[in-house]
Amino acid sequence: FTRRYGMYHLPILSFKEYVELKLNKSFESQRLENILENHVDIANDIIKNLENEKILKNFEEYIKIGAYPFYFENKDNYTQMVLDTINTILYSDLGSIYNISGDKINSLRKLLTSICVSNPLELSIESLAQKVGTSKVTLYKYIELLHKAELLRHVVYEGKRFKSMQKPDKLYLANTTLLSSLCLEPQIGTLRESFFASQLSVKNSIYYVDKGDFLKKKK
């Protein structure tokens, strides 16, 4: 008897999906290019569809609690459920799959906390390695593991695709719900960048650039 299983990657809820689930409404999906060219008309249509609901209020809610659909099953204990999920990923999933000891798992958690309280471009690998208490080589391995586990988002400078550039990498928590759950007072700018990166990275590779915030390339 052969056991068969299928694997499917399910991204976090987008802001659109969160609002649709919460309000039981349907909104047309939009390509980024169309949003950039026709954002006024699109915004007016959305506002009409929302009727008396305030879009900014719903956006503020999404930033805090919108990434994972189990929010709608248990709203009162949602933050604790997110923290429990993080611990499950760290101690059960990563610990078992990669045979990581408990002290190293604690270093992974310390890495998440360090990213949480820092501005993305203020982080250097050297200083981060010191905070976590590990070598640069090991730190890069930790970053890769957390990126694969979708707890962390690793964004490199666009120029690094072509040549060696002395530019620091940007590290974010993977989505704004993680940021809001792990950080007491997340910075507004970091929340906005984390939101944008989490929405676009589902179907795009993203880089940071000198002019503007991000460059996207189709995967």
What are the language-model segments listed below?
Residues F72-K218:
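Accessory nucleic acid-recognition modules appended to NTPase machines
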